[in-house]
Amino acid sequence: ELTFAGVLGGKKFQYTYEDGFCISLDADFVITGEVTPGANKPEGPFGDHLGYYSLAHDFPVMHVHKVYAKKNNAIWPFTVVGRPPQEDTQFGALIHELTGTALKHEIPGLKEINAVDAAGVHPLLLAIGSERYTPYLKEKRPSELLTISNRILGTGQLSLAKFLFITADDSSANEKLSVNDIPGFLRYCLERIDLTRDLHFQTQTSIDTLDYSGSGLNSGSKVVLAAYGEPLRKLCTSVPVSCPGARLVLPGVLAMQMDKFSSYEKAKKEFEALNEKLKNENLSEVALLIACDDAAFVAETASSIRCCFSF
């Protein structure tokens, strides 16, 4: 926070001490207090930046000592949280602007990264890196990209990502890759990903506190989708006849209409039935199936697919 304050203000962080507390000289308001280890109280439920309500959990309590404010024209900042685009949209854009070039130096081999706003910023990362480990081999496969991926998922707020798509810009490719061209970036990755090799799961790891898709509070899984090399498939541009009721979201990406979630037991049976139905079908041009309860919405706009990567 101190580093960010300095970058944001364009000068070193100015402070003083009073009553044993560090006081910012640039802040409009400062609240000082003490936290007693183990003295927790329930917090929540409250609305979060993904548009849902959190559950109640015990968190540390601060006993306020004093509240300081500037004498004149003090501004009390506040924000509104909810489904994107709201709070994280502005914060995300600002952080991208401030840290975009710095991350390339912080993470060796990283060229571009985009924390996608429509997914809630944290859950979905798109990245372009270098692939220099084995230039003497004919086979092109993710290698250095995996090293970069681990560094990304071990760096600050980037560690909150649930899905990380990463590839390398191949100089032989006719198109210029950009993480900001999300449909083009996903198409490039999905044409090249080897689904028997390029899905790298991290299980029983730390995740966002607000993510309830895990096995417990702050505990769950995430996945790296690393794609590099020559195209392995041509992506479909229409819904295959074997997938009636599905909607085409992007080339090679289908939204499959399912019932609204009611229980894990029912969902398990639905997916078993879907697997049985599709296992003998020719889906070679389909790289990604999205199971959802509103396929029409997911296919409606390019940003809708990004929402599917929230949790």
Model-predicted regions and their roles:
Residues E1-F311:
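Charged, compositionally biased interaction regions
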